């Protein structure tokens, strides 16, 4: 949710 929200536009899969 932290970094995934920035990279995947709201998706904490990898981060």
UniProtKB/Swiss-Prot annotation:
The entry's keywords: ATP-binding, Cytoplasm, Cytoskeleton, Nucleotide-binding, Stress response
Claim: Nucleotidyltransferase is one of the keywords in the record: no
Recorded GO MF terms: ATP binding
Gene Ontology cellular-component annotations: cytoplasm; cytoskeleton
Domain of life according to the entry: Eukaryota
Induction: By water stress.
Alphabetized Gene3D superfamilies for the sequence: 3.30.420.40
Subcellular location: Cytoplasm, Cytoskeleton
Family classification: Belongs to the actin family.
Function, as annotated: Actins are highly conserved proteins that are involved in various types of cell motility and are ubiquitously expressed in all eukaryotic cells.
Protein name (Swiss-Prot/TrEMBL): Actin
Organism of provenance: Pinus pinaster (Maritime pine)
Upper classification of the organism: Eukaryota, Viridiplantae, Streptophyta, Embryophyta, Tracheophyta
